[in-house]
Amino acid sequence: MSLAKDNIWKLLAPLVVMGVMFLIPVPDGMPPQAWHYFAVFVAMIVGMILEPIPATAISFIAVTICVIGSNYLLFDAKELADPAFNAQKQALKWGLAGFSSTTVWLVFGAFIFALGYEVSGLGRRIALFLVKFMGKRTLTLGYAIVIIDILLAPFTPSNTARTGGTVFPVIKNLPPLFKSFPNDPSARRIGGYLMWMMVISTSLSSSMFVTGAAPNVLGLEFVSKIAGIQISWLQWFLCFLPVGVILLIIAPWLSYVLYKPEITHSEEVATWAGDELKTMGALTRREWTLIGLVLLSLGLWVFGSEVINATAVGLLAVSLMLALHVVPWKDITRYNSAWNTLVNLATLVVMANGLTRSGFIDWFAGTMSTHLEGFSPNATVIVLVLVFYFAHYLFASLSAHTATMLPVILAVGKGIPGVPMEQLCILLVLSIGIMGCLTPYATGPGVIIYGCGYVKSKDYWRLGAIFGVIYISMLLLVGWPILAMWN
């Protein structure tokens, strides 16, 4: 009975939040539809945190509400007054746009890669190898995950392809070796910690190198066009290096303290892993085929970006896995995590886009410029960086966030006399990768990691908030002073 009451409370909370926001007068200068849309968006976030029903269902319902209520949530009076404007047709087109997102399908491809590792047995083999040599202590496994991701980052300009398509499929095979399973109390034995370490690794590696994540390059384009400032690959790396090294050392250990796994040492498991490797014998045809596809995909992701899109590489890999009988189609149709994540990310991308479509982002930029009048240059830098960073709670993609918010923040900073624009620009672009730890939907790998079921929603949000604050604090308190000395 108590469980039912608790679930009813969780179900009502988002509706109450939305209702209260609807009753609050629209802020000065904000389009009415933007405020009403923002109310639905906030209610969706509350629902995804409390999870009275699955998070994917929450985001799906939110998109449906916005499509049906588009006259009050998306479109302004001028659009609606145009006889040639078909509101319902445009709303439905908007609502389904997320399913054509390249990021969404790249994430889906990464999930199928993970399935390939599982079905072929290659993932289990690599996992056993890691456990044999580094599995005596859980903490060393955590550091191994971070190091592997960072070593791949300079050559893989997509964190979803790198962490989601290369690292995750391997690490996903480790927890079951320790009797730790998803969506089960045993997830905390070791699975939850290892999955969170991938969140740590992808956020650090994405900020360490310009080529660590696609939105980094997009950010540099905006910096060049709007601020007229050029940032080189080496300059980026050296600016983040002091912060990155410190976080690389402390983040796995701090995760171990804050989200401590039940299994910390296991000499027996390391010995057992060696025996299991002997039992598995030589690599099978399926495993060799998958290795070839992995190397092909990595090669195209690293060297073929000018010829073939990263998402197309992922779809090519899936097609070849099907054609070469690495993964049967029936297994893909039964792979609930992949389809669930596809719908979840597609709907979140749409909802984030709606903030711009409704006029909320434009109002936000204008209001922020007004409120920053009279601030000192350094205070302005801090405020702009923090606003840009924590605004990522509103976005389901680093690329979408960068494309939407970075031009706004740069324009605001450029318009205020005395602001050190080079320092501001570098701090803004360096923060793009590390903000990927904030929420389960913050970046492609995060969606994949959360979708596998080892880290509960409340734990993800709690850890994301803690590490999000630590990351940005280190960037401002350590990275900025060093950057100021160099300049």
UniProtKB/Swiss-Prot annotation:
CDD domains from the entry?
Answer: ArsB_NhaD_permease (cd00625)
UniProt keyword list: Antiport, Cell inner membrane, Cell membrane, Membrane, Transmembrane, Transmembrane helix, Transport
Subcellular locations according to the entry:
Cell inner membrane
Tell me yes or no: is Protein transport among this UniProt entry's keywords. no
Which Gene Ontology terms of cellular component type are present?
Answer: plasma membrane
Family matches, as Pfam families: Na_sulph_symp (PF00939)
Per the record's keyword annotation, is S-adenosyl-L-methionine included, yes or no?
no
The residues that cross the membrane are 11-31, 60-80, 95-115, 138-158, 190-210, 214-234, 237-257, 288-308, 309-329, 345-365, 379-399, 401-421, 424-444, 463-483
Q: Which domain of life is it from?
A: Bacteria
Q: What is its main location?
A: membrane
Recorded GO terms, molecular function?
antiporter activity
Its record classes its membrane topology as: Multi-pass membrane protein
Q: Which family does it belong to?
A: Belongs to the SLC13A/DASS transporter (TC 2.A.47) family. DIT1 subfamily.
**What's this chain's function?**
Responsible for the uptake of citrate in exchange with the efflux of succinate, fumarate or tartrate. Has a relatively broad specificity for C(4)-dicarboxylates and tricarboxylates.
Write down what this protein is called.
Citrate/succinate antiporter
